Amino acid sequence: MEASKIRLTVPEGIDPSRVLGAGDGVLRALENLVRAQVVARGDSVAVNGDPDEVELVARFFEHAFREAAAGRTLSADDVSRCLAVLRDGEHDASSLRDDVLLSYRGRVIRPKTLGQKRYVDAIRSHTITFGLGPAGTGKTYLAMALAVAALKRHEVGRLVLTRPVVEAGENLGFLPGTLEEKIDPYMRPLYDALFDMMDRERTDELMERGVIEIAPLAYMRGRTLSDAFVVLDEAQNTTPEQMKMFLTRLGFNSKFVITGDLSQRDLVGRRGGLADVERILGRVDDVAFSHLERADVVRHALVGRIVEAYDAYDDAREQRAHDRKESR
């Protein structure tokens, strides 16, 4: 196939460094991810290579120009996410510019992949949403950001954050200390995310007033959760009975988000409540299932490689077990 060449010009009034990144970091990241040569000189960018890739690069720079014109600067990490969206058939990558929450530190929390964007859209448009996927895909963090945003907009009157306490067998009465002291180690990931979004003093005040509640799943039994945004984390560690119990706590003007990763179950010798729930509820109106993939992992790049390595190991182990069974 004959190579294609184009030349792009950074629009007048835009600093090229906003488009190319500090030290041309965006440019270098781009060249590592496309089958095309990209050369920048001054306010001009020349692209040469596979025609489809050249077109992809042109669409990427159209997005980068719009971001720069709006005062935003892409980072090298943004490049792969934008390209993934464009390769997925989206006309442009503006779908990722969907601010969920402005944290008290002034940091904008938004979806960073197309999968995360679809997950956020599912939560917004459904009463109950299941977010399923590996570690690092933002399942819980984005759900909590949407919950905090809903509370700030007075769409709900309270937040309830919960998870099963498998490590303690949920028999917290046998542990020493106050209830808060007993559950704190198991709830710490939820606290950490919450304190990343809201001022610590304000959060403590809302918790004292009962506007924000963080509690083990066992403490949801017998309640009706109305006018609330409820997030159930680590749902792969629920039993089928616990999952049914939780889902039937739904009250009026409430939204439930259930997050989990079936590859990280801590239940031993028991079937989890997340295993069959999609088969049971998959056709129920107003219930959504959002599946996040390895491509949606946005933690340190090494996390994605770790998840991939474990998946490959598990697949190989299952294949060996299957081969042994077939040889008998």
Model-predicted regions and their roles:
Residues 32-39:
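A short, structured beta-strand/loop element
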Residues 39-96:
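Interdomain "pre-motor" coupling segment immediately N-terminal to P-loop NTPase/helicase cores
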Residues 83-99, 315-328:
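Intrinsically disordered, low-complexity linkers and terminal tails enriched in Pro/Gly
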Residues 1-17:
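Short glycine-/aliphatic-rich beta-strand segments at the starts of folded cytosolic domains
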Residues 44, 104-116, 120-232, 236-328:
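Conserved helicase motor core of SF1/SF2 NTP-dependent helicases
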Residues 19, 57-60, 243-246:
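Hydrophobic side chains in well-ordered alpha-helices
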Residues 15-32:
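Short amphipathic alpha-helix segments
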Residues 13, 51-52, 237, 297:
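Short, surface-exposed acidic/glycine-rich loop or hinge patches that mediate macromolecular interfaces
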